Amino acid sequence: MTIKDYSVSQEDFTLVYDSVLKLYRTTPLPNDLKKYYESEDYISHTDSHRTLFDKLYQWVKSYNLKHKIKLIKQYKKGNIRLLDIGAGTGDFVRSGKEYAHWETMGIEPSEKARTKAKEKGVLLQADFSNLLPHSFDVITMWHVLEHVPDVTQEIQFISNLLKEGGLAVIAVPN
């Protein structure tokens, strides 16, 4: 199946079904993924309120932050050390700290998104360096896994970062 990226690059990509993992993969995988996430049109890396769509997106994001915290609290109680992978502009990291009183940390490869997070007082790391194995109670990936080149490797990595009995919360579209 061929699809077009109407948002950023206008490129055509082919989706190939992986019967082992039961998911579609983009082929060929673009060499420079960074350019897709540094675009002004990549909405999850902005806090824009310019258009009606931007305002609606920010309202939905605000609602979802509360829902995500509530969801995690159903499964984990007490002092929680949480890592948010693909933290965007840091809103979930900040919400977890301010409203749930968790110890939070975020990973975000986009320099632009990390800068926006920093403007809000949220410090995010660019990568996984300095993270110790078995050091998190909860790891979240909100619409991130579908952007990862090697899903199996990512899941194994997350598993290694979780404490025994830890919780991985992974949301993907559809």
Q: What are the residue ranges of the model-derived segments?
A:
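Conserved SAM-binding loop
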Residues: 67-174
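Residues that form generic nucleotide/phosphate-binding pockets
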Residues: 36, 40, 59, 63, ...
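N-terminal juxtadomain amphipathic helix
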Residues: 1-52
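Charge-dense, low-complexity intrinsically disordered segments
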Residues: 12, 55, 59, 145
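Conserved SAM-binding loop and adjacent beta-strand
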Residues: 53-67
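Residue-level marker of regulatory loop/turn positions in helix-turn-helix DNA-binding domains and
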Residues: 10, 64, 133
